[in-house]
């Protein structure tokens, strides 16, 4: 599809970045799911520990531009509310 060397290189780079970003996004989702599964199980200590990891992951993804800053804040707020509701 690309007609020039430059366009071919950009297509290669775009695919490489897409795969990297997909992996990072999947890792972020996994950290969030670990918190939610701990909340469902009723284990507040595990949920709190997992939340620290998820919070860091969400902030990193927002800083790198994989998700919007407000989405990270919204997710953290909702997860934290679920943890606090366990008490």
From Swiss-Prot:
Alphabetical list of InterPro entries matching this protein: Ribosomal_bS20, Ribosomal_bS20_sf
GO annotations of cellular component type: cytosol; small ribosomal subunit
NCBIfam families referenced in this protein's UniProt entry, alphabetically: S20
Superkingdom classification of source: Bacteria
Coiled coil: none
Organism annotation: Hydrogenovibrio crunogenus (strain DSM 25203 / XCL-2)
Protein name listed in UniProt: Small ribosomal subunit protein bS20
Keyword hit for Ribosomal protein: yes
Keywords, ordered alphabetically: Ribonucleoprotein, Ribosomal protein, RNA-binding, rRNA-binding
UniProt keyword annotation of Ribonucleoprotein present: yes
Reported function: Binds directly to 16S ribosomal RNA.
């Amino acid at each position: 599809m690309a007609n020039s060397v430059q366009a071919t290189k950009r297509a290669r780079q775009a695919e490489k970045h897409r795969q990297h970003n997909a992996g990072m996004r999947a890792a972020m989702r996994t950290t969030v799911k670990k918190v939610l599964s701990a909340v469902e199980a009723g284990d507040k200590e595990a949920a709190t520990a997992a939340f620290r990891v998820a919070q860091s992951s969400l902030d990193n993804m927002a800083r790198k531009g994989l998700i919007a800053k407000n989405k990270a804040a919204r997710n953290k707020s909702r997860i934290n509310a679920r943890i606090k509701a366990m008490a």
